[in-house]
Amino acid sequence: MQFSIIAISFLASLAMASPAKRGGGGGGSGSGSGSGSGSGSGGGSTTYTACSSTLYSEAQCCATDVLGVADLDCETVPETPTSASSFESICATSGRDAKCCTIPLLGQALLCQDPVGL
């Protein structure tokens, strides 16, 4: 029992220590000067990454949340979310909450957190 408490505490501290990655979109324009001129634009698109943490890397739809840490009866997200609101609505169709979890074991995602943007 003490080992599991220590293990969960250790994993939780790792999760808090890892920085969240946030994607940035590219954009810009340019013009040339001198004898010639030119223009350009960078139309980069921002890809939504719901679970950017190394530890909490699994996007899951979970039915039961225990104290905001452990989640039970989780399923893999059936489609790729394009935003935080789409992730939330995908899970809501089955009456579940959008979560980012550690690798689940037998449907029990023991450590979970809210995805980026929620």
Curated annotation (Swiss-Prot):
Underlying gene: CRP
Keyword Disulfide bond: yes
Quaternary context: Homotetramer. Further self-assembles to form highly ordered films at water-air interfaces through intermolecular interactions.
Subcellular location as annotated: Secreted; Secreted, Cell wall
InterPro entries: Cerato-ulmin_hydrophobin (IPR010636), Hydrophobin_sf (IPR036686)
Pfam family for this entry, one: Hydrophobin_2
Signal peptide: 1-22
Induction, per UniProt: Highly expressed on day 2 and 3 after inoculation, a time when the fungus is in a rapid phase of growth. After a stationary phase on day 4, the expression decreases. The fragment between positions -188 and the start codon is the minimal but sufficient promoter element for expression. Expression is down-regulated by ther hypovirus CHV1. Expression is also negatively regulated by the CPG-1 mediated signaling pathway. Finally, expression is also regulated by the MAPK pathways with the CWI and HOG1 pathways being stimulatory, whereas the pheromone-responsive MAPK being repressive.
Disulfide bond positions: C51-C100, C61-C91, C62-C74, C101-C112
Source organism, top-level taxon: Eukaryota
Region of interest (Disordered), ranges: 20-46
Name the UniProt record assigns to this protein: Class II hydrophobin CRP
Function noted in UniProt: Aerial growth, conidiation, and dispersal of filamentous fungi in the environment rely upon a capability of their secreting small amphipathic proteins called hydrophobins (HPBs) with low sequence identity. Class I can self-assemble into an outermost layer of rodlet bundles on aerial cell surfaces, conferring cellular hydrophobicity that supports fungal growth, development and dispersal; whereas Class II form highly ordered films at water-air interfaces through intermolecular interactions but contribute nothing to the rodlet structure.
Annotated family: Belongs to the cerato-ulmin hydrophobin family.
Start-end of Gly residues biased regions: 22-45
Positions of Sequence repeats: 29-30, 31-32, 33-34, 35-36, 37-38, 39-40, 41-42
UniProt region (7 X 2 AA tandem repeats of S-G), positions on chain: 29-42
UniProt note: phenotype after gene disruption: Leads to easily wettable (nonhydrophobic) hyphae and impairs the ability to normally produce its fungal fruiting bodies. Results also in stromal pustules that are unable to erupt through the bark of the tree.
CDD domains recorded: hydrophobin_II
Highest classification ranks of the organism: Eukaryota, Fungi, Dikarya, Ascomycota, Pezizomycotina
GO cellular component, one term: extracellular region
Keyword set includes Secreted: yes
